[in-house]
UniProtKB/Swiss-Prot annotation:
Organism listed in the record: Pectobacterium atrosepticum (strain SCRI 1043 / ATCC BAA-672)
Sites where the protein binds ADP: 153-160
Domain of life: Bacteria
EC number: 2.7.11.33, 2.7.4.28
UniProt protein name: Putative phosphoenolpyruvate synthase regulatory protein
Keywords, in A-Z order: Kinase, Nucleotide-binding, Serine/threonine-protein kinase, Transferase
Entries under InterPro entries matching the protein: Kinase-pyrophosphorylase, PSRP
One annotated GO molecular function: ATP binding
Reactions it catalyzes: [pyruvate, water dikinase] + ADP = [pyruvate, water dikinase]-phosphate + AMP + H(+); [pyruvate, water dikinase]-phosphate + phosphate + H(+) = [pyruvate, water dikinase] + diphosphate
Pfam families in the cross-refs: Kinase-PPPase
PANTHER family, alphabetized: PYRUVATE, PHOSPHATE DIKINASE REGULATORY PROTEIN 1, CHLOROPLASTIC (PTHR31756:SF3)
Family of this protein: Belongs to the pyruvate, phosphate/water dikinase regulatory protein family. PSRP subfamily.
Length: 273
């Protein structure tokens, strides 16, 4: 079964996408997604409504519509469409209003927009991203005292995407350091990292998966061979055990899951932005 899914919002549509994906993941259904942010005017809403209706007429299957829109007139246009419309925020607002005993004050773009209240947090997140980019793949070993976590692992085991996700999603300053083939003859923990052992966290991966990833990057090479991958992983995991560095096999985890596990295992403060 395949269903069309619309994520419609008067803001970035990130909230609609995240919650919509979370709900749909519970069902064995294939989807074709349409993300429509900044639907703030009636003109724009009517165009979206027409798009939904046209798709319904073409396929005969009612599109699913997850929306988050503050302005009533704009919201009503969307809900008048032929789609199966679900307000992904309002379902939680009513019971929360009863519990807090205060009415909500809806404001467009509040979730991911800049306000006087969150400007400092935003600046901290941008600083974390800048730091992470400057300390990617062992580019710099300076200012490691400012890092909140230092990821270690062989090439292509997920260090860079995980570091960037930690910075962008949680404002965590994440450095990462690669162990390459040339290190394997005399693998050791670099002196520059030793003072920060409490910040070190290792990433590993199944050799077969690593070989497949490397094959896409550099096919038919020693670098991508299964034998080379196994050797590197064995050496690096032995190093982790020797220095009592906590580590995680990333083979069956998404970058979101890897990041959440690192935060949990290291007992780090988890801040959403």
């Amino acid at each position: 079964m395949e269903r069309s899914v619309f994520y419609v919002s008067d803001g970035t549509a990130i909230t609609a996408e995240v919650l919509g994906h979370a709900v749909l993941s519970q069902f064995p259904v294939n989807t074709v997604s349409y993300t429509l942010p900044f639907v703030e005017s009636e003109v724009r809403a009517k165009a979206v409504c027409e798009q939904i209706n046209t798709l319904y007429q073409q396929t005969g299957v009612r599109p699913l519509v997850f929306y988050s829109i503050v302005t009533p007139t704009v919201r009503n246009i969307i809900t008048s469409s032929d789609g199966f419309c679900q307000d992904i925020v309002q379902a939680l607002v009513a019971p929360l209003q009863e519990e807090l005993n205060i009415p909500p004050t809806p404001v467009a773009n509040r979730t991911h927009g800049l306000t006087a209240n969150n400007l400092g947090k935003y600046d901290a997140r941008i600083a974390a991203i800048d730091y992470t980019l400057a300390h990617d793949d062992g580019i710099s070993l300076r200012n490691l005292d400012q890092a909140q976590v230092i990821l270690l692992g062989v090439s292509r085991c997920g260090k860079t995407p995980t570091s960037l996700y930690l910075a962008m999603q949680f404002g965590i300053r994440a450095a990462n350091y690669p162990f390459i083939a040339d290190d394997m003859d005399n693998l050791r923990l670099p002196d520059a990292l030793k003072p920060f052992q409490h910040k070190l966290f290792g990433l590993t991966i199944d050799a077969e998966r690593l070989a497949a990833i490397r094959e896409e990057r550099r096919g038919n090479s020693r670098y991508a061979s299964l034998r080379q991958c196994r050797m590197e992983l064995n050496e690096v995991e032995a190093l982790f055990r020797k220095h009592q560095i906590k580590y995680l096999n990333t083979t069956n985890y998404s970058v979101e899951e890897i990041s959440a596990k690192i935060i949990d295992i290291l007992g780090m403060s988890r801040r959403m932005y």
